[in-house]
Amino acid sequence: MKLIAHRGNIVGPNPLEENKLEYIEAAIAGGYDVEIDVRCEDHQFYLGHDEPQYYVPMTWLVKRKDKLWIHCKDFKSLNIFSNSPIDFNFFWHENDKYTLTSKGYIWTYPGQSYCSNSVIVMPEVFDLQNTQNNDKISYNKKSFAICSDYVGKMI
């Protein structure tokens, strides 16, 4: 089972560090895949959940493509990735219960049914206090992956 660090978070949300290149690199170095928020502005890529915050070179994305789950935050980035000859793993969604990634995984909104090809997203939303207060939390191992702010606590 893959564990995906949401915006680079491992032991809880850290808004000041999320989507920063160094933060993402640390999560990858820790053995995790990472979900990142990508936007395109003036033919350049930026990371940032609500707005373009951190410039990211295409070469950086290519080098780490096997560890990244790219959440396209606008049409421009979605269009560029969908036409790229490089085999990136990317997706776009807003409030969908399910979204299919470019590699065929089912990005699954919290609380929805899932299967062995699903990525369960943010399971902690149903028990946040327990997640925050425990050093280790168990998770369901019957999905392909879990994307969470707390992957470092999962056993």
Predicted regions and their residues:
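Phosphate-group recognition and catalysis centered on beta-loop-alpha active-site segments
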Residues: 1-155
